[in-house]
Amino acid sequence: MKISGKLKISGRIAVVALMVLLSACAQKKKAYVERPVDQLYNEAMNSLQAKDYGDATDKFDEVERQHPYSVWATKAQLMSAYAYYQASRYDDAIIGLDRYIQLHPSNSDIPYAYYLKGLAYYEQISDVARDQLMTELALKTFQELITRFPNSQYAKDAKIKIDLTYDHLAGKEMEIGRYYLKQRQYLAAINRFKTVIDNYQTTTHVPEALHRLTEAYLALGVFDEARKTASVLGYNFPDSEWYVDSYKMLGGKEFKRKSKKEPWYKVW
């Protein structure tokens, strides 16, 4: 009797499990019922406009799954990446954009794909005290956009973003240089400040880099190089507070660059 009861219970459990499985399969099958491409795409756009980005990405992906050879599938790939970007899911956006660029290299929206990819990196830029990989990747992507599509409507803003990434990378070099200077590792500090002066000449960090370079040379007792660097600072940034500080460090002597023909960043 006990065995028979157990068999009945086991049988009921099996029936229930089978029903649950069949129900799940039915729901799954129902979720993938093919629908008109325009209906799917419009629903995805409605979700995007409602800022329901998760639902939007799901529906854009569904467009591609159900209608892979439709022109709407190509649009959906790009819009899915855009929805990921809006949701701050930058890694997913970048993956989608890389795939889009690879599959549709001649599409008219490729410049925008590069621009959006650059923005996805740009939004992840961290403080100068931390790793600057995202800054470097943003810079590389924006540079590629400008190189490949110089007349694109996105090129102008990409150039602005490039200047900002340069300033950020220069800030990182300054952060490290100041640390070395504080630790009295003067040669290491000099290399960092020279990197700013040589590679990031248009950034806001150049005046301080010249001042810190002067300071490092003075600490090493290389007075001629200190005076030469201060003269470059005074010639190019005479109203800078950093020149005032360098002027004081050098005993109040004012220095000017002798030759105006020589580029200011090539004096050493």
Regions found by a protein language model. Give the residues of each.
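Bacterial N-terminal signal peptides
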Residues: 14-22
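Acidic, polar-rich low-complexity tracts and alpha-helical solenoid repeat scaffolds
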Residues: 2-4, 21-268
